[in-house]
Amino acid sequence: MKQRGWTLQCTAFTLFCVWCALNSVKAKRQFVNEWAAEIHGGPEAASAIAEELGYDLLGQIGSLENHYLFKHKNHPRRSRRSALHITKRLSDDDRVIWAEQQYEKERRKRSVPRDSALNLFNDPMWNQQWYLQDTRMTASLPKLDLHVIPVWQKGITGKGVVITVLDDGLEWNHTDIYANYDPEASYDFNDNDHDPFPRYDPTNENKHGTRCAGEIAMQANNHKCGVGVAYNSKVGGIRMLDGIVTDAIEASSIGFNPGHVDIYSASWGPNDDGKTVEGPGRLAQKAFEYGVKQGRQGKGSIFVWASGNGGRQGDNCDCDGYTDSIYTISISSASQQGLSPWYAEKCSSTLATSYSSGDYTDQRITSADLHNDCTETHTGTSASAPLAAGIFALALEANPNLTWRDMQHLVVWTSEYDPLANNPGWKKNGAGLMVNSRFGFGLLNAKALVDLADPRTWRNVPEKKECIIKDNNFEPRALKANGEVIVEIPTRACEGQENAINSLEHVQFEATIEYSRRGDLHVTLTSAAGTSTVLLAERERDTSPNGFKNWDFMSVHTWGENPVGTWTLKVTDMSGRMQNEGRIVNWKLILHGTSSQPEHMKQPRVYTSYNTVQNDRRGVEKMVNVVEEKPTQNSLNGNLLVPKNSSSSSVEDRRDEQVQGAPSKAMLRLLQSAFSKNTPSKQSSKIPSAKLSVPYEGLYEALEKLNKPSQLEDSEDSLYSDYVDVFYNTKPYKHRDDRLLQALMDILNEKN
């Protein structure tokens, strides 16, 4: 009897478990606002039922006759519970044979599961492509990749998109490129033939174009080199740099086969010597204009440009008319440490950033190389632009109807500032967008860009408008050393006219400035919304007396703002060279934008924690603006803010002021630990490091020296804050604590 009772209990328990499991499965279902029904009588009967019962008739289900799909007019899009009452009412209709509410079904692709990104491809250098995959050993480290793999996992790999590389040629028979080579996207303007093959020489001087093309379209899973960002795209090469370059050659290259080529990638420009001011000639400018108007069947060619490698020479890409063009997407670089590399230039025209080389300890970029070889040492902004071009190819596969301006909006709206947040110079513009003269709107995020470009939800941006503001009564204004010229520019942004602008894109300030030493000029423009932008920073090597003649200084920093109000132009010379003199001859402000706000901008930009910065992979809390007080001239010159003979009370006062500015405790700990573990060898090893101390004023002076000038927001009294490079030690660095330690030791040495 007991045995029978036990059996009944077990059976009951089993049935209960099965019932719970079934209900659990059912509970996990997500029911959608769609009903399938079998109805005889054709579409007329289905339409009548829909109208009577409050449905929208979505149509016949596939090729199944008498089967229709309905959507209820007053039901949520998704629900965890089925709407039994709605289903019953539909089923009770005599004309309905069968009805069922639809629910989401989980389906998985029956492909072999991958253990990790390391196993995605058999290409031998794939594991070295740190910028395309998450190579972290622990989740506590920040992600470094461009978020490309999630796009590939959707099957988006660049199919149907054509990119051409304007450079010194393309080794098109390279076994990692040949399968994706497109002869219709290729030409040799140096020798005027259809073969862009590079000229070999003993130094492999003409490897540049092949390396850039490899980044974009190296074939996947062919046991050769690495993997291109858009590894199923088609790539061509324009050979135009290996010989005499003329305006005609540039125009022919920029405008080559615009009905076939989608994206043009260029990693070149005028000399990055810190003293050149040059842009496209008349013909090249017309080629750009033709490309955006007629290219890609009227949707506009996509021009991707490297922002320049003149950082060591103090160059400024605002003096490069190619990156400064409204028609190009100017791409800067970030190192593996998430920092602005030594070669990078600053300017207000840079739109976004991708990864490239940094210090000698950082990994570089992998690609194909001459003589059917491979390389892991591709460097500079030359390597950043092709990565961006590859990402844009992924977006064009996802949505071929994107216009050239759509692409720029997508870049602005999805680039991430957080991975680069430990760099100085970030500011929020009047539209709530984070922007930086070193990085534009931040690091490219391929997944976010492609997701936003989804043709099911993306709406092409409104028609572009142009509004020109100028003062016909303006009289030339004189400028001398240690002087300034301020021009107030009130505008209604062509309000009430067909070309009225309510949402900004690019802003151009076209000016003629005569000056005895061009490199001493500093130009800022403050928008009606209060965003201050450095249009031109000093260039020590630029001693030219030629000034600027009708030069377009371009900025993207006010993107999304309403331009109505008063803008302020300020031109200064703080060099102290008393012999300097000149004048502002004429100017005009050119606003580019739209009369109505683009659809995707009607809600504020939301920044995510993707690729969160953690102080160069050290797990230290993120730096914030240490202080917000205005800089003194000493701070702008990189000098210590407290002289050697300062009293302790003055040091204490300054420390109290900085505590109110919320200095980072993590930085203090980092300085202390760095000093402790790197003390001179004469210190006894028996003394515990915890007993070592750094003078409190030394800690704060190090913080000031490293952060104060460069962390300040732009204001009338901090024109130079975005361009002070004290933060980036000129000596090779490995991690942030090395630079902090170096600054601290410099301070202590000065005191001893």
From Swiss-Prot:
Q: Which reaction does it catalyse?
A: Release of protein hormones, neuropeptides and renin from their precursors, generally by hydrolysis of -Lys-Arg-|- bonds
Catalytic site positions:
167, 208, 382
Q: Which residues form the Peptidase S8 domain?
A: 129-450
InterPro entries tied to this protein? Galactose-bd-like_sf, Kexin/furin, P_dom, Peptidase_S8/S53_dom, Peptidase_S8/S53_dom_sf, Peptidase_S8_Asp-AS, Peptidase_S8_His-AS, Peptidase_S8_Ser-AS
A GO cellular component annotated for this chain's UniProt record is: perinuclear region of cytoplasm
Query: Pro-segment residues?
Result: 28-110
P/Homo B domain location: 460-597
Task: Give the signal peptide, or none.
Answer: 1-27
An MF annotation (GO) of this entry: serine-type endopeptidase activity
- Is Protease there in the keyword field? yes
Q: Which domain of life is it from?
A: Eukaryota
Q: Which cysteines are joined by disulfide bonds?
A: 225-374, 317-347, 467-494
Kindly indicate whether the keyword Translocase belongs to this entry.
no
Task: Cite the EC number.
Answer: 3.4.21.93
The residues that carry sugar chains are 173, 401, 645
For this UniProt record, give its keywords in alphabetical order, as a comma-separated list: Calcium, Cleavage on pair of basic residues, Cytoplasmic vesicle, Disulfide bond, Glycoprotein, Hydrolase, Protease, Serine protease, Signal, Zymogen
Chain positions covered by the region annotation Disordered: 631-662
Q: Where in the cell is it found?
A: Cytoplasmic vesicle, Secretory vesicle
Q: Name one GO biological process term.
A: response to glucocorticoid
What main location does UniProt list? cytoplasm
* Function of the molecule: Involved in the processing of hormone and other protein precursors at sites comprised of pairs of basic amino acid residues. Substrates include POMC, renin, enkephalin, dynorphin, somatostatin, insulin and AGRP.
Specify the protein name. Neuroendocrine convertase 1
